[in-house]
């Protein structure tokens, strides 16, 4: 895959349920602490090496941001550094939280 693909929150949820993809969240630390998809890896410049050491580059990666815009650049970057299949989630965390509130780990709703 040379370019990332965009997927709907529904498609991302199916991957999440099946544990068939890694979920990464690129939002700022405060936003991530306040709430994120259950099991999401908080991807920052400081945690990129950790992801690369832990990840299977053949396993799909789903990238989540606030609304689905910033995740596109991050998705392309992950492809460029060797991940084989990368998705950007349309609507980002806002769509995920709206559609799947039970799949959110937050200060008010711990997983």
UniProtKB/Swiss-Prot annotation:
Question: What are the catalytic residues?
Answer: 65
Where does the record place it? Cytoplasm
Report if keyword Transcription is assigned: no
Enzyme's top EC category:
transferase
Provide the GO MF annotations for this entry.
thiosulfate-cyanide sulfurtransferase activity
Q: Which Pfam families does the record associate with it?
A: Rhodanese (PF00581)
Question: So what EC number does this one have?
Answer: 2.8.1.1
Catalytically driven reaction(s): thiosulfate + hydrogen cyanide = thiocyanate + sulfite + 2 H(+); thiosulfate + [thioredoxin]-dithiol = [thioredoxin]-disulfide + hydrogen sulfide + sulfite + 2 H(+)
Q: Which GO terms describe its cellular component?
A: cytoplasm
Q: Does the keyword Magnesium apply?
A: no
What keywords are annotated for this sequence in UniProt? Cytoplasm, Transferase
Rhodanese domain location? 17-105
What family does the entry list?
A: Belongs to the GlpE family.
Give the function comment from the record.
Transferase that catalyzes the transfer of sulfur from thiosulfate to thiophilic acceptors such as cyanide or dithiols. May function in a CysM-independent thiosulfate assimilation pathway by catalyzing the conversion of thiosulfate to sulfite, which can then be used for L-cysteine biosynthesis.
This chain's protein is named Thiosulfate sulfurtransferase GlpE
| Organism ancestry | Bacteria, Pseudomonadati, Pseudomonadota, Gammaproteobacteria, Enterobacterales
Q: Which gene encodes it?
A: glpE
């Amino acid at each position: 895959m040379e370019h990332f693909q965009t997927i709907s929150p529904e498609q991302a949820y199916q991957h999440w349920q099946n544990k068939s993809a890694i979920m990464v969240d690129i939002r700022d630390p405060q936003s991530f602490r306040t709430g994120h998809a259950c099991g999401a890896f908080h991807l920052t410049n400081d945690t990129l090496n950790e992801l690369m050491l832990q990840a299977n580059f053949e396993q799909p990666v789903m990238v989540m941001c606030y609304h689905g815009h910033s995740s596109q650049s991050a998705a392309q970057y992950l492809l460029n550094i060797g991940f084989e299949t990368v998705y950007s989630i349309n609507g980002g965390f806002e769509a995920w939280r709206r559609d799947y509130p039970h799949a959110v780990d937050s200060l008010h709703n711990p997983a």
